[in-house]
């Protein structure tokens, strides 16, 4: 089943894969990593001016990593704004996805958290560095194949 936005993307020659609708009726797409930045700009111009959230997850041990974006099209006088969910997948060997910081500034800390926990590198992000874990931390704690260390030496904050 194809939704309104999917039909609009096809009409304008924008390559994507529809993943259907979630339980709330929000359409979900898969976008190729190399196409993500240009499609993000187009969606912003089309009216998806609010990035509600960004998160990431490990699909399976040794498998792909996913970056998920929830976008909302806010218009005055509309009770039910249009929403869409975008999934961008990256390989575990080279997990690189274009940052959309220049499109939605609110993605700043969210992409940094995804980098910190899963190791997804967001190309052209202005401040991509660890945000939760210490800089000296080795590995990506939310990957399914991550082996937690037996201990970690906590340093004084002084």
Curated annotation (Swiss-Prot):
EC number(s) stated in the UniProt entry for this protein: 7.1.1.-
Disulphide bridges: none
Keyword annotations from UniProtKB, A to Z: Chloroplast, Membrane, NAD, NADP, Plastid, Plastoquinone, Quinone, Thylakoid, Translocase, Transport
The keyword Plastid appears for this protein: yes
Lineage: superkingdom: Eukaryota
InterPro entries attached to this UniProt entry: NADH_DH_suC, NADH_quin_OxRdtase_su_C/D-like, NADH_UbQ_OxRdtase_30kDa_su, NADH_UbQ_OxRdtase_CS
Sample GO molecular function, one term: quinone binding
GO CC field: chloroplast thylakoid membrane
Gene Ontology terms: biological process: photosynthesis, light reaction
Main location: plastid
Localization in the cell: Plastid, Chloroplast thylakoid membrane
UniProt enzyme class: translocase
Membrane topology (UniProt): Peripheral membrane protein
Catalysed conversion reaction: a plastoquinone + NADH + (n+1) H(+)(in) = a plastoquinol + NAD(+) + n H(+)(out); a plastoquinone + NADPH + (n+1) H(+)(in) = a plastoquinol + NADP(+) + n H(+)(out)
Function: NDH shuttles electrons from NAD(P)H:plastoquinone, via FMN and iron-sulfur (Fe-S) centers, to quinones in the photosynthetic chain and possibly in a chloroplast respiratory chain. The immediate electron acceptor for the enzyme in this species is believed to be plastoquinone. Couples the redox reaction to proton translocation, and thus conserves the redox energy in a proton gradient.
Subunit structure and binding partners: NDH is composed of at least 16 different subunits, 5 of which are encoded in the nucleus.
Family: Belongs to the complex I 30 kDa subunit family.
Protein name in UniProt: NAD(P)H-quinone oxidoreductase subunit J, chloroplastic
Upper taxonomic lineage: Eukaryota, Viridiplantae, Streptophyta, Embryophyta, Tracheophyta
């Amino acid at each position: 089943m194809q939704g309104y936005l999917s039909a609009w993307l096809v009409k304008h020659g924008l390559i994507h894969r529809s993943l259907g609708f979630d339980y709330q009726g929000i359409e979900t797409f898969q976008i190729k990593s190399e196409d993500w930045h240009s499609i993000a700009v187009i969606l912003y111009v089309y009216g998806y001016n609010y990035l509600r959230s960004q998160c990431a997850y490990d699909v399976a041990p040794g498998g792909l990593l996913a970056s998920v974006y929830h976008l909302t099209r806010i218009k005055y006088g509309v009770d039910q704004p249009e929403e869409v969910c975008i999934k961008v997948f990256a390989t575990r060997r080279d997990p690189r996805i274009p940052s959309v910081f220049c499109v939605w500034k609110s993605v700043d800390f969210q992409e940094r958290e995804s980098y910190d926990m899963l190791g997804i590198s967001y190309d052209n992000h202005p401040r991509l560095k660890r945000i939760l874990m210490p800089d000296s931390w080795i590995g990506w704690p939310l990957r399914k194949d991550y082996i937690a260390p037996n201990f970690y030496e906590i340093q004084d904050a002084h």
